């Protein structure tokens, strides 16, 4: 996964920088975990207790205060991780880590996670906004009022803690969906096999389904990681398009179609304790520190829950209440589609659609790349 390589690059940069900044570590501020802290916007006092592992348990008198405090505490623990994720989906990594982040920046700009998330945010219901906004306010309260507590890693890597918006929470969901559902790479491979070998021979190497717009899958053909394929298009345009996409996504090889995550439920009749049990294994890389999930306990009237969520998302993604346990299982299903446009041979600035020649919409963006040899240490 490209995130792993980015984190490794950041880790290498951090090791180099450590020799220059080691003396700051012992004196750098650590988030306050005792005493009273001011959190603007609370309607009643909130208590945060931490166990021996540092896991926070938040006790509030109402749900908005609970979510506001969760945002605050999450920023205390994982602000660097949150800012790293945001810089990744916004395509701003190269400005901090140089050439190592450029491929990721190009990929994110092409996918348009940031723009799509802002459009999605405009469609949020009032209930969704009421759930998300207190969390955002809590994150920003920590960023604004506790600048001295910000993680040392932010300065080492060159990232700034910026105010968060509702769109950032939506973008995180889009980003996680992208990183955990990558069958589009298998679709590109399937299309290339079909173009070079023909659909029948390609199907012997990789399960695939015919394009539903031209023919339904016949008996014996199954949906698969390869997804739908189109009939071999003209060489002009389509091959160029696939080649361009391949260049953008070459660092990410297709996943093995046999992997996935799992949940295991044990009935009370079969457990040693006499109680039902749920074991959840989301299959996330445990070599990445901090981990993808942030463990937390949430307690308010009507809410008694412990579990974990992604840093940047309120509530819980997996965990348990006094009534039920729930988990996350990734099936790596066919949830992404790749569309290959055919260039107009008479005008490469146009593409063909239904016999018509239509102009491409251009969206030119500049990507800043950290470069010690460039004026001001940055090039575009």
What are these regions (language model features)?
Residues 260-262, 273, 292-294, 313, ...:
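Residues that flank catalytic or metal-binding motifs in active/ligand-binding sites
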Residues 5, 19-277, 282, 289, ...:
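Substrate-recognition/specificity elements adjacent to catalytic centers across diverse enzyme folds
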Residues 301-377:
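Compact, glycine/acidic-enriched structural inserts
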Residues 59, 67-69, 274-275, 286-290, ...:
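Short helix/loop capping segments that flank catalytic or ligand/cofactor-binding pockets
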Residues 13-21, 317:
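Hydrophobic cores of alpha-helical transmembrane segments in multi-pass integral membrane proteins
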Residues 1-15:
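N-terminal Sec-pathway targeting helices
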Residues 153, 207, 364-368, 379-380:
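Ser/Thr- (and often Asn-) enriched beta-sheet segments in non-cytosolic proteins
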Residues 157, 167-178, 292-297, 332-335, ...:
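Short secondary-structure boundary/capping segments
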């Amino acid at each position: 996964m490209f995130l792993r390589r980015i984190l490794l690059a950041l880790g290498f940069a951090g090791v180099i920088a450590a020799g220059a900044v080691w003396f700051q570590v012992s004196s750098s501020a650590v988030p306050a975990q005792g005493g009273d802290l001011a959190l603007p916007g609370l309607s009643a006092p909130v208590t945060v207790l931490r166990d021996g592992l540092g896991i926070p348990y938040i006790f509030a008198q109402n749900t908005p205060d609970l979510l506001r405090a969760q945002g605050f505490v999450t920023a205390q623990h994982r602000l660097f991780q949150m800012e790293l994720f945001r810089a990744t989906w916004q395509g701003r990594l190269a400005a901090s880590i140089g050439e190592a982040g450029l491929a990721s920046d190009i990929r994110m700009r092409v996918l348009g996670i940031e723009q799509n998330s802002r459009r999605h945010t405009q469609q949020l219901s009032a209930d969704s906004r009421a759930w998300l906004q207190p969390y955002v306010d809590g994150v920003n309260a920590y960023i604004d009022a506790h600048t001295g507590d910000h993680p040392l890693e932010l300065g080492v890597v060159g990232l700034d803690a910026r105010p968060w918006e509702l769109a950032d929470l939506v973008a995180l969901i889009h980003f996680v969906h992208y990183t955990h559902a990558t069958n589009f790479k298998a679709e590109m491979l399937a299309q290339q096999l079909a173009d070079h070998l023909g659909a029948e021979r390609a199907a012997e190497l990789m399960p695939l389904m015919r394009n539903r717009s031209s023919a339904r899958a016949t008996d014996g053909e199954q949906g698969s990681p390869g997804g739908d394929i189109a009939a071999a298009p003209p060489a002009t345009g389509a091959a160029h398009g696939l080649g361009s996409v391949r260049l953008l996504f070459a660092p990410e090889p297709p996943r093995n179609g046999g992997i996935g995550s799992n949940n295991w439920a044990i009935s009370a009749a079969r457990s040693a304790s006499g109680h039902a049990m749920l074991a959840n294994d989301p299959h996330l890389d445990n070599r990445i520190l901090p981990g993808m999930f942030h463990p937390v306990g949430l307690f308010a009237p009507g809410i008694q829950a412990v579990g974990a969520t992604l840093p940047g998302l309120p509530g819980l993604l997996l965990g348990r209440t006094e009534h039920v346990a729930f988990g996350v299982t990734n099936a790596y299903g066919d949830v992404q589609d790749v569309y290959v446009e055919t260039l107009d041979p008479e005008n490469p600035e146009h593409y063909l659609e239904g016999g018509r020649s239509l102009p491409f919409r251009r969206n030119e963006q500049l990507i800043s790349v950290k470069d010690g040899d460039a004026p001001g240490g940055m090039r575009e």
